[in-house]
Amino acid sequence: MKQKLTLLTLSLLVAGWQVQAAPQAASAPRQASAPAASAPAAANPAATQPVTAVGLPEIKASAYAVYDAQSGQILASHKLNEHIEPASLTKLMTAYLVFKALEEGKLKPDQTFTVSEQGWKVEGSRMFLDPKTPARVDDLLKGLIVQSGNDASITLAEAVAGSEAQFVQLMNAEAKRLGMKDTHFENSTGLPGAQHYTSVQDLITLSAAIIHDYPQYYPLYSIQSYSYNNITQPNRNLLLYRDPDVDGMKTGHTDSAGYNLVASSKRNGRRVISVVVGTESMQARAAESSKLLNWALQSYDTPKLYEAETAISQVKVYKGADNAVNVGFIDATYITVPHGQAAQLQPVLETVQPVLAPISKGQVLGTVKFMDAQNRVVAQKDVVALNDVAEAGFFGRLWDSIVLWFKSLFSGS
């Protein structure tokens, strides 16, 4: 049986552009029947888009999305999970794995590597590595991110894994770990391949992971130009020159893919990420990305509803040393809503009953669905136990077993 509890009172504090919200006392649980075996659904940003505050401008791209990095919500999308050709957006994963190797001490920024014959002869964009001159890892990273150098990509792949083929195996394993369900890589560069694809959703996932997991390396994405081997090349992300709030991330282009761009903007402490693919030109991908970023920042608020590990309610526990467990969220909870509508949010707690001891802190016990004024789900978040509950003794467990048996007779389960 699923227990449903409406948390009626939210304390709203307005600070500048951002609405801050904090929960107050919860009302008594409201019961709702549901199969006992059903598990709480995990939050799915694509399935819980906020209701549009104002009309989304026309986006001229074959696929796109815009995402709020605090709440984890997709605010608008088109062909979110369809396979697309990433082109040099592939290098987001190449860079992610290099950042990981640096973090783990497997590479050092001042280590040097010489471009292989494969890397030197590779087609497409390059940083113009000299086969006679070893290059430092930190220079190779700038050549990869700023200049989109395929020679830099292959050299870094070989530095991390010994060969590009072995590096590609790491890329696919990391994609799986990150939950990129519609991605498969064939190379580190983004050159076309029959089984080289990703999706807009997966690019959002990867981009958010870079920003969250490796903030110390993220400033590389805002570099406007880089000189190597006496050759200066500009960053092809035109938004870096046009919008002071934009600080990344990566461009991509092939004849078959069109012009792609992952862009990120941070304004007044709030970050949004956009993806556009299949546009007609460098100018077009910048213009369409700018539309998405500005629409998201101007049309939506992302209030903080709960601090990390704040108890929002108690849930009845059977067969436990304690009769109830405090539930809440592991991390601070943000929800993105149309501008000015934060006060209308109504959180509804749902737990699968019965909740049986033993319970470990951090164990998922249900979800909170955030409903708008029309009773539509805006977002949902897993709710977890905030404390351990040990198992009761023999007689305590026996008594609760009897209680649950009688409850099942009357509930029909």
Where are the regions a protein language model picked out?
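Domain-terminus/edge residues, biased toward the C-terminal soluble/receptor-binding domains
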Residues: M180-H184, P192-Y197, Q201-S413
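Hydrophobic alpha-helical membrane context
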Residues: A15-G16, E103, Y300
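Bacterial N-terminal signal peptides
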Residues: L8-G16
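Active-site-adjacent loops and short helices of periplasmic peptidoglycan-processing enzymes
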Residues: A22-I204, A208-Y214, Y226-N229
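Sec/Tat signal peptide C-region and signal peptidase I cleavage site
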Residues: W17-A21
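Bacterial N-terminal signal peptides that target proteins for export
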Residues: M1-L7
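Structural motif marking the loop-to-transmembrane transition
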Residues: K2, P86, V137, E391, ...
